[in-house]
Amino acid sequence: MEGPAFSKPLKDKINPWGPLIILGILIRAGVSVQHDSPHQVFNVTWRVTNLMTGQTANATSLLGTMTDAFPKLYFDLCDLVGDDWDETGLGCRTPGGRKRARTFDFYVCPGHTVPTGCGGPREGYCGKWGCETTGQAYWKPSSSWDLISLKRGNTPRNQGPCYDSSAVSSDIKGATPGGRCNPLVLEFTDAGKKASWDGPKVWGLRLYRSTGTDPVTRFSLTRQVLNIGPRVPIGPNPVITDQLPPSRPVQIMLPRPPQPPPPGAASIVPETAPPSQQLGTGDRLLNLVNGAYQALNLTSPDKTQECWLCLVAGPPYYEGVAVLGTYSNHTSAPANCSVASQHKLTLSGVAGRGLCIAAFPKTHQALCNTTQKTSDGSYHLAAPAGTIWACNTGLTPCLSTTVLDLTTDYCVLVELWPKVTYHSPSYVYGQFEKKKTKYKREPVSLTLALLLGGLTMGGIAAGVGTGTTALVATQQFQQLQAAMHDDLKEVEKSITNLEKSLTSLSEVVLQNRRGLDLLFLKEGGLCAALKEECCFYADHTGLVRDSMAKLRERLSQRQKLFESQQGWFEGLFNKSPWFTTLISTIMGPLIILLLILLFGPWILNRLVQFIKDRISVVQALVLTQQYHQLKTIGDCKSRE
């Protein structure tokens, strides 16, 4: 911006249809789906970049929601300028230039939304007065629509020269690390906290000088969010790709009392569990039933003498039991509030009365035994172990008070249980008999939520008590929690794929996920179909599986035993298929060459010796012939 100083700046200038088919199918399926939970915690990184040099002036990462992850960003003016202003005497290469730059005001103009007449990058988007929206100047530039405010830090302007503390003596006052003495503070405005940060936003910064041209620099602000959501599939629908048979039978270990170690024996460090593999349909559902059995067998062993545990084919697949508990406050998001713990599925059925957060509507106040309102401030409410917050926007282990203050969300603390029904053997066998038993009324289906509701708040999840039962109970409950978490993620992924699917309607209708999963188990002989349920027999030895699973286990053991008995040479052929071809190709020439090297000298010596012998014989014959002739001539002369 050129020209003399002005007396008064100008005023700021303020510049379908949904997928009905998918929605209808989801409503038909009875599954409540929301967008990503507003309480979902992400790893958010804000990056300030000098567009003149491409260097990063600030990179700040934090855990938070998309609503409250807007920290203050601190950096230095020289991080945005570099050596660009050296010709004006205000550059950052020398201490004097850094000190002089500190005495001038500065103003900032947005480049992401450029009003008419404000110019382009060359002018720093400040082509005329009134384009500036923030800065540190005597006329106090501001704006009601821009996304950020940029001010100077708390370093006094009259502080000494901006010497680099690493290059000068420590006695010199005013020396700072790197000679940075022009600190800036970037804050987000209310408009910035509501804006979309899908791409970088650009601003121009200029120093205000009474005469001459105001020097220009430009910077960008970018938000990077890790694990923000699943990838959008384009091509074959991935919903049914993980419908795999169980990889191996589930081994149920009965609880055993701990045995004291022998005197003088060193403590045994438990082996590290092998890395988990991606589970298919069979493994995931069987783990879910097995976890339910473990928890039920531990708390009510009389009910597992002989029973049938059944998975329902129709939703809801999970139930919630409202409980009372003590949550913990955190100023920053704890580790258990990660993206992997978030679920955008909502519960269609919650029983009991528990702890409620925020203002509940009258239609849901029957779920509240105690209602608490959040106080002022920004912090996270972490649910106790074994529980989760059930909100109208989804399931989450942590609540953000910032989100609760800005929205109409309401949440209740619940235990989450899979929809597993419990049947006695007589009822199940009666259903399969040719002449079915007639009941005056349909027997009441006992679910896991009715049998084990309140288990976590009773102390089992927290590990209350020092006996063996409490310890084993905690392990079994954690196994059930892990199985539920895996299954919830897969159901959630299936619904997301349905929402994003670009395939035909027939394929979308085919993806009634849980029905296909249970049909897959039934056709594989792994469960018995009882009405709309898939049932597994269980007794005190655990879940009974199909004999084919045991056969697969035996074959796997035999294969491992066979491989362990092989020598190292045989193992080479099994581990490297190309090794066999290579050996068979070069073995013939290699053997011939080896035979030549071994027997070649001996054969050559024998051949040379044979030739010498033959030559010696020939020479002897020649000499003998000559001697015979001389002797004959001598005899003739003597006769004469």
From Swiss-Prot:
Glycan attachment sites: 43, 58, 297, 329, 336, 369
Motif CX6CC per record, residues: 527-535
GO cellular component: host cell plasma membrane; membrane; viral envelope; virion membrane
This protein's record includes keyword Transmembrane helix: yes
SS bonds (residue pairs): 109-126, 118-131, 307-310, 307-535, 337-391, 356-368, 398-411, 527-534
Residue numbers marked as site, Cleavage: 441-442, 621-622
Spans through the membrane: 583-603
Modification after translation (UniProt): Specific enzymatic cleavages in vivo yield mature proteins. Envelope glycoproteins are synthesized as an inactive precursor that is N-glycosylated and processed likely by host cell furin or by a furin-like protease in the Golgi to yield the mature SU and TM proteins. The cleavage site between SU and TM requires the minimal sequence [KR]-X-[KR]-R. The R-peptide is released from the C-terminus of the cytoplasmic tail of the TM protein upon particle formation as a result of proteolytic cleavage by the viral protease. Cleavage of this peptide is required for TM to become fusogenic.
Sequence segments annotated as region (Fusion peptide): 444-464
Keyword set, alphabetical order: Cleavage on pair of basic residues, Coiled coil, Disulfide bond, Fusion of virus membrane with host cell membrane, Fusion of virus membrane with host membrane, Glycoprotein, Host cell membrane, Host membrane, Host-virus interaction, Lipoprotein, Membrane, Palmitate, Signal, Transmembrane, Transmembrane helix, Viral attachment to host cell, Viral envelope protein, Viral penetration into host cytoplasm, Virion, Virus entry into host cell
Region (Immunosuppression): 510-526
CDD domains: HTLV-1-like_HR1-HR2
Membrane topology (Extracellular): 33-582
Xref: Pfam families: TLV_coat (PF00429)
Coiled-coil stretches noted in the UniProt entry, renumbered to this chain: 473-509
GO BP annotations listed: fusion of virus membrane with host plasma membrane; symbiont entry into host cell; virion attachment to host cell
Intervals of motif CXXC: 307-310
Membrane-side (Cytoplasmic) residue stretches: 604-640
Signal peptide segment: 1-32
InterPro entries: FMuLV_rcpt-bd, TLV/ENV_coat_polyprotein
Motif interval(s): YXXL motif: 627-630
Domains as described in the record: The 17 amino acids long immunosuppressive region is present in many retroviral envelope proteins. Synthetic peptides derived from this relatively conserved sequence inhibit immune function in vitro and in vivo. The YXXL motif is involved in determining the exact site of viral release at the surface of infected mononuclear cells and promotes endocytosis.
Other facts noted in the record for this chain: The sequence shown is that of isolate CI-3.
Subunit structure: The mature envelope protein (Env) consists of a trimer of SU-TM heterodimers attached by a labile interchain disulfide bond.
Function: The surface protein (SU) attaches the virus to the host cell by binding to its receptor. This interaction triggers the refolding of the transmembrane protein (TM) and is thought to activate its fusogenic potential by unmasking its fusion peptide. Fusion occurs at the host cell plasma membrane. The transmembrane protein (TM) acts as a class I viral fusion protein. Under the current model, the protein has at least 3 conformational states: pre-fusion native state, pre-hairpin intermediate state, and post-fusion hairpin state. During viral and target cell membrane fusion, the coiled coil regions (heptad repeats) assume a trimer-of-hairpins structure, positioning the fusion peptide in close proximity to the C-terminal region of the ectodomain. The formation of this structure appears to drive apposition and subsequent fusion of viral and target cell membranes.
This protein's name: Envelope glycoprotein
Gene name in the database record: env
